[in-house]
Regions:
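Juxta-kinase regulatory segment immediately upstream of eukaryotic protein kinase catalytic domains
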Residues: 1-29
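Conserved ATP-binding subdomain of kinase catalytic cores across diverse folds
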Residues: 27-45, 49-183
Length: 183
């Protein structure tokens, strides 16, 4: 088991194992340069295939009701995934399908929307003994994130992505979303 913080290895590994992830935990490490939540990347051996997951400890100073934040994410991602599946070619609906090769049309739904992984108790979060809330996602391979806007072309792409996200939510008719950061 690899980790950069050996004092937390056992407790973090046990937290990650509280989620409904098939296979054996191979390794994990802190991931990214996030400013709000603590993020970790884990690798699991699933019948000989290495599958990665993102785990986040939610910052309760920023989000005072973490369960509401996660419930909003679940509602939104399920809505978008259902739309993408309804519109997709059959091959695109396979959640663990690898990144399509150049020239192929099908893009897996798991590359277009976050896949929130439930805890083994059925909730979409785990509360550790210290009262910290954790959530887990299937890692989106080959995705790129930016810490800062490096060009106007990148700003346009970000705007296009935000617009596409808003369009995907334009017909959301599910339960009202929770207000997670009050005015």
């Amino acid at each position: 088991m690899n980790s950069t913080n050996t004092t937390d290895t056992l407790s973090q590994a046990e937290i990650f194992k509280r989620f409904a992830i098939y296979g054996d935990l191979v390794s994990f490490k802190p991931f990214g340069g996030g400013h709000i939540n603590g993020t970790y990347l884990s690798v699991w051996n699933q019948a000989g295939t290495q599958v990665r997951y993102t785990h986040q400890r939610i910052n309760r100073r920023v989000f005072q009701n973490p369960a509401a934040v996660i419930e909003n994410i679940r509602r939104i991602t399920e809505h978008i995934a259902a739309k993408l599946i309804a519109e997709a070619e059959p091959a695109a609906t396979i959640a663990t399908q690898p990144t399509p090769q150049p020239g192929t049309a099908a893009v897996p739904v798991s590359r277009q929307v976050l896949t929130l992984i439930p805890a083994k108790d059925g909730r979409y979060f785990y509360i550790d003994p210290a009262g910290e809330y954790w959530r887990t996602y299937l890692f989106i391979e080959d995705a790129v994130t930016y810490e800062r806007m490096e060009s106007s072309a990148l700003a346009r792409k970000a705007g296009t992505a935000i617009g596409a996200f808003q369009r995907q939510l334009s017909d959301y008719r599910g339960p009202a979303l929770h207000e997670t950061i009050p005015d």
